[in-house]
Amino acid sequence: MANISQIEQYNKGTLFPNTYEETYLATEHISGIKLNIPDDVFNKLKKAIEAKGLYFGDDSVLRNIIAGLIKGNIILQGPPGTGKTTLAKLICDVFNVDFTEATANSDWTTYDSIGGLQPTANEEGQEVIVGKNGYVVSSILKCCDLIVQNEYEDGKQQGNWLVLDELNRCEIDKVFGDLFTALGSDSTTAERVINLWYQKDENKQKIYIPNRFRIIGAMNNIDKNYVNDISQGLSRRFTFIDILPPAEDYFEKEASNAKELAKTRAYFADMLAQVEMWIAKQKKQHDDVRKENTVEAGVGFGCGCVGCFG
């Protein structure tokens, strides 16, 4: 545990802690460290997606994901079964960041995103009220710890991102509205701060969002029972990218390609029947998804599609 003198040095930026658990104020001094963009990031992401069995019909999907992350936070929106959550985790791996995963629901409030008060028992068994950080703040703290470790230790991940699944199930503006200014990609360091009213320790009543921190949301925008409106204020804080099933003629083209390969490659001819059955199965699954794709939510990027093979 750090003593008062050490915490003062952390807060002034003259000394860097191994962890920011004891003083959030010190996060100001590493908040400006830029996100490292991996060399050849496009091809690395493309290979990672292909290795996982995902299909993308247009390279612009990946280019827009990368551009969106360089700018700030992104939301992957589309029907279920198109690989949005898997894609989000692959993105984190390619960018060399750890991630905190959470699944939203209709009961979420700012308590879940930022934090609030909760009862607990102290060492004497008495009930006390303490502050509890929400998913955003917890992920930011992990991000700050990794930023410092990455600066001084080889092989460390460069940060921690928050992956939010089923984002459409919560009242998005109510849950994240208090973060509007702080989440702005053009916000200054002074603005990229979250006030934590529920923390009693004055060293923990404010936390700065690192430049390296990102939120990747995944939204099912076709479920009429769970599609919540997104205000223009919040939509400007995220880049929305459509993750859709493959084009209707994609599987016919793949079947045709398989037949052509079978004419010249004997080993492939033996597998042709299995390949055709697999293609037919995938086509039916994606046709079913496409039929349900009738509701729009958020701000569509209109930038291509990604489909899940498996």
Where are these regions (language model features)?
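C-terminal regulatory/interaction module of P-loop NTP-utilizing enzymes
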Residues: 1-310
